[in-house]
Amino acid sequence: MRRIVFVIIFASIGSLGAWAQQGISGTVTDQQGRPVPAATIKIKDDNNQAIADSTGVFSLPSIPPLPFTMEISSAGFNTHEIVVTDLKKLTSQFILVNNNELTEVVITSRRRLETAQSVPIAISVITGKQAEDAGAFNVNRLKELVPSVQLYSSNPRNTTLNIRGMGSTFGLTNDGIDPGVGFYIDGVYYARPAATALDFVDVDRIEVLRGPQGNLFGKNTTAGAFNITSRAPGTTPGATFEVSYGNFGFIQAKTSFTGPLTKNKKLTGRLSFSGTQRNGLLYNTISQKHINDLNNLGFRTQLQYRPTEKLKITFIGDITDQKPDGYAQVVAGVVKTQRPEYRQFNAIIADLNYRLPTSNPFDRIVDHNTPWRSGNQLGGTSLNVDYKIGSGTLTSTTAWRYWNWDPSNDRDFTALPVLTLSQATSKHQQFTQEIRYAGDFSQKLNGVIGAFLIDQDLKTDPYHIEESGSAQWRFSQSTSSNLWKTPGLFDGYGIRTNSRLQTFGAALFGQLEWAVSDRFFVMPGVRFNYDKKDVEFDRKTYGGLQTTDPALLALKRLVYTDQFFTANVEETNFSGGLTLAYKIEKKFNAFATYSISYKPVGVNLGGLPTSNGAVMLELARIKPEYVTHWEMGAKTNPTKNSTFNVVFHHTAIEDYQTLVQSPEIGVNRGYLANAEKVRVFGFETDGNLRVNKHLWLYGNLAYTIAEYQQFSNAPVPLEETGSTKSFKDISGNRMPGVSKWAGSIGGELTSNTRKALGNSGKLFFAMDSYARSEFSSSPSPSKYLNVPGYATLNTRFGFRADEGLSLFAWARNIFNKNYFEQLLPAAGNAGHYAAVLGDPRT
């Protein structure tokens, strides 16, 4: 795959005007005190820059209001970042170190600027440049760089984003529960899991925080958080353009423009576009076209107004429209269930004179007679106000977002007219308001306190629809009665569901940091939650044979039934935690955390199972989760050119919210239930090593055990369908979606600075590999629905210019490894199951 990156930086067009502060001047030297000529000094996210002369002297005549970050760089040296909060304390001599020493990464997860190595939190940071170089343009690809992250997606709505195996239900999504992993972009909480399908645009950095973070973020996060920060508008005009080409018709284009919008540069803006297209990776013999393509368009704009040094106002608006013909799954295998022989999948399709198009899922061939569609549209606006008060900043973030979902699925995964329609069209709107203060309260005490409100409205548009076809009788047949063969009995028989979920949540949260000494720090945190959910669910049957025959009506009710229920639930809860941190020395920071947290009450929004013909209304409400968590770790710099971090963690959850599958067609998307107790424990390590100025190595490793300590009323796995028991005790068994081992390793080799393509830059060659051990893909452990372990290798090489034109080629899954990402049973548990396939070599 070839990727061309055009970067056009326009020259400065004037000073900041009368409002600007005084400039900055100084000298850039190396560690031996020798001047570094031609060093670049710039204001981060501003494009305002200067070049040092032959004696290393530079001058930046205009700078933005405090605080800001300076970047000083030169070929052969590490980029040096300086957070400027007080000009009086700023040195006039800036020392660059040889780039065989690692650069510290600055983050804002604790609502202030600090380095990742100094924060007593298990955190992984991926810069925007690292994500772009690795081709990680969305969360699904980013997971390869952070092994503790698991993402499973059979389409954008049915997406599971977990950290350490916790966060959301595995498999299909039920809209009635909250995610345990918070997803934030520029301080705004994104409530819908479909947001993880967004293409990254203008990303500055991605911070992945592991473990409960409810003391720091507005929305409660019991498993962790993604905190994504975009590049801010600059006061100097600039533009970037990037286009990538690849096999399967892949093309991706991104462009961004930034600069001042007024003469005094108090108002600046950034305008960004992105587009991704790729042909389908599966071939449908029925439609005679390739499906599972990519078709994404995104638009994002930012306006930033700085009327004074103390006040910054940022407006952001974005729209993303994704219209792929996807996401189809491939039949991956057939299991013999405990039903009678005539109810086995192979016997059923033999009676219907049907054969699967292939027995090898990696032929990537399907014969689906219902079109696949995943219309995914997200957008919104936000207004962020930062105002410096005393030694801190008061922040207000107001946001409105929407999500429109327009799908079509073939849930029987065959050419047979079994489930001819499965369309859960939905509309969602959310409003959030967060107010917080972060700063120093005294010389030894700092922290963050805040309040958060969220209001959500999710409704069908106009309804969810499931419809059977003429072959449904054979899959539903549970007796030898000839009544099942009644012509037209199930043809066009379906359900239309009107539902609405209205959610309101409020929280007070905060965390303090008390410097007991120069080395010992105590960080207590507390949170109060209020959650209210109101749901109305109304499902009506329609179609099929119109008859008054009680026997035929009874057969129809075995497939679909009317359902109606309402649920009104509300809960309040206190939670909190305590972190102790000790800096043994500058290169060794140890920490330990204990916390209790809470995941709100849930409601079933995909229909309820039945027992002896009666709807199990007791399952309409799902108990909240109670999470007890501890972790301890250390962040170290063994040498000046290396880091090594390790953390041990243990989480116990009571009333774990999980999604379970049912053989009932009426709840083929599964339903929510509580597992009494689960626990997750393990350790994680990550490290970086700058061998010399040419070679950089890095790696991550995660060991995770996730198990049900007590789940006495779990559904039976696929192969036990038809047994005398509908539920079983799976206590002591493993949870789905969690590999015992997962890791990544990589490195980059660069040349000395040279001229190429008319620009100064470096040649580079990089490789990275991601691997994970096998894992269960069934809520109740199965002998068959287990995904084998796999490893993939990616590579890239080319020329990276300091400014101007860069050119490089890259390949993912270079050895074309065939692997599954997820396995899931077909509706009705007839015995066949499908797979979400990993991408081939691209």
What is each model feature region?
Residues 304-308, 437-440, 446, 450-454, ...:
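Structural signature of Gram-negative outer-membrane beta-barrels, strongest in the C-terminal barrel
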Residues 178-180, 192, 201-204, 215-285, ...:
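Outer-membrane beta-barrel translocator/receptor signature
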Residues 438, 448, 518, 645, ...:
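Gram-negative outer-membrane beta-barrel transporters
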Residues 29-34, 39-44, 71-77, 87-132:
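Short, acidic, small-residue-rich periplasmic hinge/interaction motif at the N-terminus
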Residues 384-389, 393-409, 583, 589-599, ...:
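Membrane-embedded beta-barrel scaffold of Gram-negative outer-membrane proteins
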